[in-house]
UniProtKB/Swiss-Prot annotation:
Pathway: Secondary metabolite biosynthesis
Gene from which this protein is expressed: orf1
The protein, known as: Probable alcohol acetyltransferase orf1
Induction: Expression is strongly induced under conditions of nitrogen starvation. Expression is positively regulated by the cluster-specific transcription factor rua1 that recognizes and binds to the specific 5'-T/G-G/T-C-G-C-A-T-A/T-C/T-C/T-G/A-3' upstream activating sequence found in all promoters of the UA biosynthesis genes.
EC number: 2.3.1.-
Coiled-coil zones: none
């Protein structure tokens, strides 16, 4: 199988410069050992169909007709990252993996591979008793697509393989139309520009998970293989939550973000007796503006939000503050995003983070895909950060928490996780 790692003799290929949030994701990848590289896992039940790895290879190759991003790669040959079109053939991005025990093992295996300058597919071997299921991993640099865009590719791949007729298999799946970013902004989309966003960013967060110094973290927290937690709610619990949010005129994403902040206060604030005590949270708000964000440009709004809530604030009060801030972030002017990220990167190296508030990526309700039993998405967490993903698949809400191993106190992680999930359980009981 040809290597996807370019040799030093490869010619310098033409390409376009990175823009906006692409710059940020590539900076993290290049300067911080692949930080935020992504892996998406698809567990597919093929039923009585007798499929082989070769069937997946053919279907992957056919997707190159539909998704231009599959032939793109991030190149650093010129000294600055750029996106190169037509730089990859299907056979260069298809791999097979070994028999592994569970989904987390497949995630760990995928993150250890040098396959993050472009999109690639790994089909894992299965034992004889598991021939009815296939385990797939799509790996990608964040600059080439977000989780929802990669899910769209996985969906098209699965539908292609499971097509009932050869004619269906040969007909490429058309990607959904990609709306403009302006469709998600209001008529006041120029209200927020660089100055407003930098003022918000300077606010910072008053509390967060304390980051252990790298030089002492190994002594304080013994190295652990575990770096991720997952919880899945039942369809009934998920529907209860959806109806609750509708009744409160809130999105599920805003309500979940509020529960995260509420759980952080419960975890980290020992004395909440002062009625006037306030907490400030500043996090990056990155709402997806397209169901398919793999057209060669990342499609997130890199705008920080900041809210102030009392240490004894009720969950509903926090949720309303979050919803208001999300609305504010959506008015961040599109044409200043690139300048904002450029300036942000200049400041990035001069700031030493002391605490971490979990980033929150909500994919919403994903399309039902025939045969898709399970799905996971992760981002490499080798910076001293914490991150949360949320998605609903097959009417079940899935929540994950990931963290950089040995950079946070285990008791903080454990208490936050149990408090957060426990709060949601109480509401949907």
């Amino acid at each position: 199988m040809p290597s996807r790692i370019p040799s030093s003799n490869d010619p310098v290929l033409p390409g376009r410069e990175l823009w906006g949030t692409e710059r940020f994701w590539h900076f993290a990848h290049h300067e911080h050992q692949g930080a935020f590289d992504m892996v998406s896992i698809f567990v597919v039940d093929v039923g009585s169909r007798h499929l082989s790895i070769e069937d997946w290879r053919k279907a992957w190759s056919k997707l190159y007709r539909t998704f231009a991003v599959l032939s793109q790669k991030i190149s650093d040959d010129s000294g600055e990252g750029k996106i190169v079109d037509g730089a990859l053939r299907a056979e260069e991005s298809f791999f097979t993996g070994p028999i592994l025990q569970d989904d987390q093992d497949r995630i760990d295996y995928s993150l250890q591979q040098r396959r993050f300058d472009c999109l690639s597919l790994t089909v894992f071997a299965t034992s004889g008793t598991e021939h009815e299921s296939f385990h797939l991993a799509i790996s990608n640099p964040h600059a080439l697509g977000d989780a929802k865009g990669i899910f769209a590719i996985g969906k098209a791949l699965i539908q292609g393989v499971l097509s009932q007729t050869q004619a269906e298999l040969q007909s490429p799946t058309s990607p959904p139309p990609q709306p403009s970013l302006k469709a998600f902004t209001t008529s006041h989309n120029q209200d927020l520009g660089l100055k407003a966003m930098f003022e918000v960013a300077r606010t910072g967060s008053s509390i967060g998970f304390p980051i252990l110094p790298k030089e002492t973290s190994a002594e304080l927290e013994p190295a652990s293989r575990e770096w991720r937690r997952v919880f899945t709610f039942s369809p009934a619990q998920t529907e209860t939550l959806v109806q609750l949010c509708k009744a409160k005129a809130l999105t599920v994403s805003a309500w979940l973000q509020a529960t995260i902040l509420h759980a952080l206060i419960d975890t980290l604030v020992d004395d909440k007796g002062d009625e006037k005590a306030e907490q400030t949270f500043t996090v990056a708000a990155m709402p997806f503006h397209s169901p398919l964000s793999v057209s060669g440009a990342t499609s997130t709004i890199f705008a920080p939000i900041s809210i102030r809530v009392g240490s004894k604030a009720e969950l509903n009060d926090i949720a309303e503050a979050v919803a208001e801030s999300f609305g504010l972030a959506r008015r961040f002017a599109e044409d200043v995003q690139d300048d904002y990220v450029k300036t942000l990167l200049k400041l990035f190296g001069s700031v030493r983070l002391e605490t971490s508030v979990p980033t929150f990526s909500s994919l919403g309700r994903l399309d039902t895909v025939t045969g898709l039993k399970r799905y996971h998405v992760v981002a490499r967490n080798n910076l001293p950060t914490t991150g949360i993903h949320a998605w609903t698949l097959n009417d079940q809400l899935n929540l994950t928490l990931s963290w950089a191993p040995a950079r946070f106190r285990r008791d903080h992680i454990e208490k936050f996780w149990s408090t957060w999930i426990g709060t949601i359980k109480e509401v949907v009981a």
